[in-house]
Amino acid sequence: KRGNLQVIKSSEDNWVEGVTFRLYGTSLAGIEVDEYAVTDKNGVALFSDVLISGTTPYTIEEVDTAIRYVVPANQTAPINWKEVTTRNFTNILKKFSITVTKSDREEGTPQGDATLAGAVYGIYKGETLVDKYVTDKNGQFTTKEYVCDNDWTIREITPSEGYLLDSTIHKVGAEPQLYTVEHNQTCLLYTSPSPRDS
């Protein structure tokens, strides 16, 4: 006796074709089942003519999840005679936000008329400016969330009062392989040169 399993794949960035799923467990007859199916252009993977499951349902897992996604949890599914069981899997993109703290390179805190507030920074994807942020009175800002990738950087665009422009390009360190969950936070300490440094 056999049945079918349909896995429906979705993702935040709509990449659903070519994803491999594994179905494994022990059938009602005591036979080990270990099968693979790949999603089509619509994100559907079909396991056909699978031996019906026993009291313990089969396990379904996504295989070789792309590094940009959080690995979805395994699911279980019973296979019943002449029925189609459906399970849905969603890929969630790994995201990051960064808190940047600007400080005085020499003293740590601003000297004289200098201030850490009002410096304008850009967050760049490759060479493209994506957003601008302005430091608060504590010399800080926190970005919104962005999708993890290897080429995010922070650059100072306009220094705050009493400081020179720091032209250093700082890598964010938001490579997707560093993370396993959806929401990730990272920090960057930015020391700024004052005119007395030159």
Question: Where are each of the predicted segments found?
Answer:
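Solvent-exposed loop/turn and edge beta-strand elements of beta-rich ligand-binding domains
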Residues: K1-S192
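A short, hydrophobic C-terminal helix/tail in secreted or cell-surface proteins
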Residues: P193-S198
